[in-house]
Amino acid sequence: MSAYKTVVVGTDGSDSSMRAVDRAAQIAGADAKLIIASAYLPQHEDARAADILKDESYKVTGTAPIYEILHDAKERAHNAGAKNVEERPIVGAPVDALVNLADEEKADLLVVGNVGLSTIAGRLLGSVPANVSRRAKVDVLIVHTT
């Protein structure tokens, strides 16, 4: 039985974040609720990200790919053993979105991968794992995925 009742995991569709989903699902198992979150910035609000990130911008702007990312992550979570899985697309920067969601849901654990978007995106958005671990008020698991 899991000591955690609610687990939040962030994904941007990267291999690293999907491995974090796998680990979060294993922890949640059949007993805990697993919330898979993906943050995005609407293109009309952050056209600058699209200019800077080019081909990688779809991971943080617009809504179309978010639902596919969340669907794929939910399927992976079920395959890894999670039973109670919710998907949450969230408008906002990844760190703010994950920390706020964990607070709102009274999560016991927040899970992120140790590597996220490309180096350029990381420079633009900052290190999600480092910033989440500093700001979260709940346990944070940084899954080594490299």
Swiss-Prot record:
Extent of the signal sequence: none
Record GO cellular component, one term: plasma membrane
Biological processes per GO annotation: response to antibiotic; response to stress
Superkingdom assignment: Bacteria
Pfam families per the UniProt record, alphabetical: Usp
Family the entry assigns: Belongs to the universal stress protein A family.
The protein, known as: Universal stress protein Rv1636
Organism field: Mycobacterium tuberculosis (strain ATCC 25618 / H37Rv)
